[in-house]
């Protein structure tokens, strides 16, 4: 973006004359439920628009996952340990070890340690739709018994499980099956 500022400094950007017939331009950027990173549109506008109003929008979608690229937040590019630095420069690495990430407790032979965090977790209390992909091989298989983590939470509102055959997890948002299922849910 700095190159655009050099080539097209803000004071040389042509602006449209405002009149009563000029309709306002309202941009609403969203980041798929990621509240941690500001959308790039929040601090850089396009050079060919004279914006009258700008509304950055962050929609929090719990459980959707993080949508940012690790290059923006992590100088080590998501590598847990950078061998080029001395250990005293990587205190975060040792903190991650103490919290169990990124190995999930397998280095301590305590993979089930997170079960205690889910004990007594209340049901959400709203009608729930769960869309998930099936029918593709995965590197690991998780088999949950009827007592996961201790007992299934019970709620009065229905919980709908909608399998999507042949849909990969990360491609689910681009799948036509997913959009059809969402339309059926929203439109009835």
Swiss-Prot record:
Its EC number is 2.3.1.43, 3.1.1.47. Keywords: Acyltransferase, Cholesterol metabolism, Glycoprotein, Hydrolase, Lipid metabolism, Secreted, Steroid metabolism, Sterol metabolism, Transferase. One of its GO terms (cellular component) is extracellular space. One of its GO terms (biological process) is cholesterol metabolic process. Glycans are attached at residue 20. Central enzyme in the extracellular metabolism of plasma lipoproteins. Synthesized mainly in the liver and secreted into plasma where it converts cholesterol and phosphatidylcholines (lecithins) to cholesteryl esters and lysophosphatidylcholines on the surface of high and low density lipoproteins (HDLs and LDLs). The cholesterol ester is then transported back to the liver. Also produced in the brain by primary astrocytes, and esterifies free cholesterol on nascent APOE-containing lipoproteins secreted from glia and influences cerebral spinal fluid (CSF) APOE- and APOA1 levels. Belongs to the AB hydrolase superfamily. Lipase family. This is Phosphatidylcholine-sterol acyltransferase. The gene is LCAT.
């Amino acid at each position: 973006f700095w190159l655009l500022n050099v080539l097209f400094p803000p004071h040389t950007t042509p602006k449209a004359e405002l009149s009563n017939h000029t309709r306002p331009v309202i941009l609403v950027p969203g980041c798929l439920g990621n509240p941690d990173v500001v959308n790039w549109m929040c601090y850089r506008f396009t050079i060919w628009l004279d914006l009258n109003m700008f509304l950055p929008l962050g929609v929090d979608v719990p459980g959707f996952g993080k949508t940012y690229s690790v290059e923006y937040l992590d100088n080590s590019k998501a590598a847990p340990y950078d061998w080029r630095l001395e250990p005293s420069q990587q205190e975060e690495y040792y903190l991650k070890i103490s919290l169990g990430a990124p190995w999930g407790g397998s280095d301590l032979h305590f993979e089930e340690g997170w079960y205690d965090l889910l004990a007594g977790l209340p049901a959400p209390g709203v009608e729930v739709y769960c869309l998930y992909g099936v029918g593709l091989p995965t590197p690991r298989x998780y088999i949950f018994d009827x007592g996961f983590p201790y007992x299934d939470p019970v709620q009065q509102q229905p919980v709908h499980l909608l399998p999507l055959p042949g849909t990969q997890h990360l491609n689910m948002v681009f799948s036509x099956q997913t959009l059809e299922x969402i339309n059926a849910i929203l439109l009835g």
